[in-house]
Design a protein with these regions (language model features):
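Soluble ligand-binding/transfer domains with enclosed cavities or grooves
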Residues: 1-160
């Protein structure tokens, strides 16, 4: 699978802003592994951040929820230790925005929960989001986060 560089992603982002992406929830479902990140305003991916997040096995997991909602989790792990945020997400607008709210955070070791806490809801106008840019049939997804950084994920192989 050929992944795009920063310049190609910026071109795709311009197109997404002008025309929308046509993406719907069904093409977003799955477990996505973070591959590259570009800091706000940069055309070069951050080598260190990408290396660190790949080393921490950073992932975004999207599943079908009730009605229009998606179930979302974001996790990092080192060996058997995992930190996972869980919540709900929904798509809004033509581009669209994937807005989400984390409800809980969990710390597990080898699948055993050591800590689980509820997370206070953010103010409505401060919800985190990903402005979706492109979902490629070859298995990658690009989006820009609320903080302005650009992220590229790769769809993980389906688990049996």
């Amino acid at each position: 699978m050929k992944r795009p560089d920063g310049a190609a992603l910026l071109e795709l982002e311009t197109t997404a802003r002008q025309r929308g992406t046509g993406l719907n929830a069904s093409v977003l479902l799955g477990r996505w592994r973070l591959r590259s990140v570009w800091p706000k305003g940069e055309i070069q991916a951050s080598s260190f951040s990408g290396w660190a997040l790949r080393g921490l096995q950073a992932e975004l997991d999207l599943r079908s929820g009730e009605e229009e909602q998606l179930l979302l989790s974001n996790a990092v792990s080192i060996g058997p230790l995992e930190l996972r945020f869980r919540g709900e997400a929904s798509l809004r607008g033509r581009r669209p925005l994937l807005t989400f709210v984390f409800k809980t955070v969990e710390l597990t070791v080898s699948g055993r929960c050591l800590l689980k806490r509820e997370i206070p809801a953010p103010m409505p106008n401060r919800k985190p989001f990903f402005a979706l840019i492109h979902r490629d049939p070859s298995g990658w997804l690009a989006a820009r986060g609320r903080g302005g950084g650009l992220a590229l994920w790769e769809l993980a192989p389906a688990e049996n």
